[in-house]
Amino acid sequence: MTITAIDAFITELASQATTKSLFNPFRDERLANNLKLYFNFLIRTPVRLAMIGEAAGHRGCALTGMPFTSPETLRDSRNPFFASHRERMFRQGDIFEPSGRWVWGVADAHGVVPLLWNALPFHPHKPGEPRTNRTPTRTELETGEYFLGRILDIFKPEVVVAVGKKAEQSLGKVFPDLAFHAVRHPAMGGSTLFKAQMADILKSFA
């Protein structure tokens, strides 16, 4: 993978329109740059772990440009990526995202910098209510599946984990022959099971 490939991917991502119920954070150059810094860090070594979620959330990726990553994570995480890039990243506010805390917490506990992505890389919300989340439509997920296919083809992670049912369905559709793990999404009371399932998957990462 090359920096040119990263630039082309992010440029195409940023070209997608924002609508009254679907926000594209990557149209903001500051958030697109956060993602670029993250991807450029990941290409230095083979990616061992990818975790795929459902969609960008209003407390996380919609504010930072990074899946499962809130402004609080940008500010406080001790992960090697944030420790080395924090001063170069754009941060707005200090809000936290529970799912992001759990995902990065698992990664940090096992000493990995994961490739984080979403089945839908944009933020679906109620019309006119950007500070809400909603379940993505099938049509939206089909758009997201194009980018999902590209990102996994580019990084070729060793282990792929679907976080939640929507991610599991999209991965199965895009990569029908891919052997991947499926775990409970940590939201809505699923954090304990999520952490246990991830610990089992990542035993070899110690």
PLM features per residue range, with description:
Residues 177-206:
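Short, flexible loop segments at boundaries between secondary-structure elements
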Residues 2-159, 167-169, 174, 178, ...:
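A polyanion-binding, active-site-adjacent surface
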